[in-house]
Amino acid sequence: MKDRDVNIKFKKDPVLLDKMLQELQQKLMDSLPWLNVAFGRAYKLARHDDGGNKFLYPAAYNGKSEYISLLPNDNFGNFSWFDIYDPQEITPISQALPQYTFNGALVFWYNLDSIYEDNDFVYTEEIKNEVLRLLTTPGIVSGASRLNITKVYERFENIYKGYSLEKIYNNWAYKGEGVAAYDKQFFMHPYAGLRIEFNITTRNLCQYYIK
């Protein structure tokens, strides 16, 4: 997968969750010069091996019924993606303008050597500080909306929480799907990642579909 194969497109008139995520995608790209690709929402896909084992992984939709794996890689530089949880909550504040709340995580995967020339230290705290400062900027989400940061994960298995990498590591089941190669190549310096969990509450997105 080369950079030219990544197809980031934005809907012309997004609503609900798409509207919020597209705005955040654009702000991430505008504000973080080291971020090469800001993907939108990830989808949970499955691969099955000959032994009947199922491997779950996050993937971004790339158009034309194609998906891109978001497992640790160096195919398209430093990247981010959104992991959105079920359920999404709707609170009937009023019939015409209910409150809409969703929870999720913003995940980053990056190569420190592409960001810092100095490799005598691990600069993950600097990256975390930069991202958190951006996400807590007043007005980071538009309209009558509020974004709250709730948790930050940095261990590799927790960055991929909810997918098979987490299960493999937590159960000490090191087998299949090239996990040993991930260990050797991507789970050590200069590679690192972040999983920032959040919730967003808004009232200005639901009015378009309430009759």
Language model region names:
Residues 79-80, 104, 196:
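A broad, low-specificity signal marking well-ordered, structured residues that form hydrophobic/aromatic
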Residues 84, 108, 196-200:
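Hydrophobic side chains in beta-strands
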Residues 1-38, 95-99, 149-211:
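Short, charged interaction patches at domain edges and termini
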